[in-house]
Amino acid sequence: MSKVFESKSLIEEAKSRKKQYETLEEQLNTLKKAFQGVADLGDNFKGNGADNIKDFFQGQAEIVDSWLTLVSAQIAFLNGISGDIKDQELNDSYVETSFLDHELPNGDLKASEIVSAHKEEIDSILSGISDIIDLDMYTLDDYADKMGDAQKIRRDTITAVDKLDESLTTEYQNLESLDNAVLTKYSVLMQATSNGKSASPMYYDKKAFHSNEVYKSVIEVENQGTTYIDAKTQQAEARRLQEKAEEEANKPWYEKTWDGVCNFTGEVTGYYDYKRATEGVDPVTGEKLSTAERVTAGAMAAAGFIPVVGWAGRAFKGGKAIYKTGKAAIAAEHALDAYKTGKSLDILKMTEMGAYGLVASNGFSEAVTGRDMFGNKVSEEKRKQGALEAITIIGGAGLAHYFDRLYQKNAPYVNKVSNESLISNIAKTTEEKQTRLQYLRNKHGVLSKEDLHHRINLRAEVLNELSRIKSSGLTKKQRGPAVAGVLDKKTGNYYFGINNIDGKPPKVLHPLIHDRIVNMPTELKEGYIKTSGAGSHAEVNALNEALLQRPDADLKDLMVYVVSARKINKKMPEGVPMPRCPHCEYITQNTNYIPEALKYGK
């Protein structure tokens, strides 16, 4: 279904609606005071049925409390809309999903056809003058990568709009239970004023009102509403602290004053962590921390980790509260790692050594000299802890960097080795760069413009499949490390696969796949151990499905592409091409496997 999203209009409407609820909230509070005034008359109001009447107005005040809970929940929901939009990275956006679903892909295809045609013409011209001057044919690598990136942005935008729409709609619909709760509660109150023949506040039975089973169910729903409001409050606080963390992250390290770091630390870690990092007191053990330890804790809080307390607090995950009618299911945790986005941590590493360097410097100072950054003596235990902390933080490369810059006189060999290695690597890289194009062409060959189109389309479809799998509810373990796609160039059909978590090949095997698994050379099968089982990987599952659909297919007509289904390591984030394992190389041999390094040409 086509959707139109405009962030500015939605946010403005939410603000307008919020003001209306705030006006209603003021009126309800006035009404509650009036009801409570009658209920609190005490001995000033006596006589036949007076106590029942006062109890009745106390019940009315309770009904108003239910209205106030409903209003507060609606205000909390409306307050969170702008944050929900930001979580999906749709700030200042206007999106028509029909355009992204249809017009834009058609435009991409047309653009690819035009670019390929132009390249063919230029290649023809360069070939015509090759006897005069030898020029390398240019490739479409950069174009393919940029088009792939653009398609990913398109898909991510559609997914973001769908997620936001579903999230807000579901959350709002769940709040309707509070509407029903108020009306039901009022109905039970009215029932409690009846004597069987007529209804009057004089006949009000407070015990009957509170013991009614329907009343008890309503109270449970209202408690969920209160929990929802608390969750939204925590959500708003988490978002505020994340913004503050990013603001702090963008400051140069030398602008992060001790007081500023203390205040920042106190806000992001909660009361206990505040006591530890800013006052130097552990509220659990009562131990007093040194000034150096407090500075270290403050710096590491700004950088994303508090060494005194570790990863502390409760985590607010997913950027939204989960509210379900009938169960008190609110997922709203509050933690430091929620406030530290990847971008924040990257910035917080700063220039040179930055905040991490402050801690490393103090740690090495304690280990080498037996004194902290302020010259105070530390115990043997603290010296060992300081060394371990510093080494853990900056790692082997950071260790060399630290000694190079701070202990050059005492560690000349480290500096010499580092410089010689650097010069060697630069020379090696220069030599490789001069022959890389020819090397890749010799190794991988070149692609026709038809295969270029196939590759772009296959890449897009595999990333679409990855997006679908991520939103399907499968855990990271269930979806495994890879998603593979196979394009049958003859039929234009796509087939997909993920790893079998039990390490088993497909239950129904194409004869070719079966033979290759069974007849795999022993040294190959036993020589590769980083697998749960030969034939269980994503590309084998996808290829097997394609062959089952067209058993007599020529393997050269089957194009295979594999990407990471999650972040494997720093060099292999989610969604990047993956190499095949030795088992899969053997099983999928002779297919049209597309490595990312492949160069295109005539």
Curated annotation (Swiss-Prot):
Inducing or repressing factors: Expressed on rich and minimal solid media likely in early stationary phase; dependent on DegSU. Not expressed in liquid LB, but only under conditions that promote biofilm formation.
Keyword Heme: no
Family annotation (InterPro entries): Bact_secretion_toxin, LXG_dom, PT-TG_dom, YwqJ_deaminase
A cellular component term, taken from the record's GO annotations: extracellular region
Domain LXG: 1-235
Residue ranges of the TM segments: none
Chain coiled-coil ranges: 6-41, 227-251
Keyword Cytoplasm: no
Pfam families per UniProt: LXG (PF04740), PT-TG (PF14449), YwqJ-deaminase (PF14431)
Mutant phenotype after disruption: Deletion of the ywqH-ywqI-ywqJ-ywqK-nfi operon has no visible growth phenotype, however it is out-competed by wild-type cells.
Major site of localization recorded for this protein: secreted
Intracellular or extracellular location(s): Secreted
Keywords attached to this entry: Coiled coil, Secreted
Summary of subunit composition and partner proteins: Probably interacts with cognate immunity protein YwqK but not with non-cognate immunity proteins. The interaction inhibits the toxic activity of YwqJ.
Purpose of the protein: Toxic component of one of 6 LXG toxin-immunity modules in this strain. They promote kin selection, mediate competition in biofilms, and drive spatial segregation of different strains, indicating that LXG toxins may help avoid warfare between strains in biofilms. Mediates intercellular competition during biofilm formation; disruption of the operon disadvantages the bacteria, but overexpression of the cognate immunity protein restores growth in competition with wild-type. Overexpression alone in situ causes growth arrest but not cell lysis; no effect is seen on DNA or rRNA.
Similarity comment text for this entry: In the N-terminal section; belongs to the LXG family.
Protein name: Toxin YwqJ
Source organism (scientific name): Bacillus subtilis (strain 168)
Gene: ywqJ
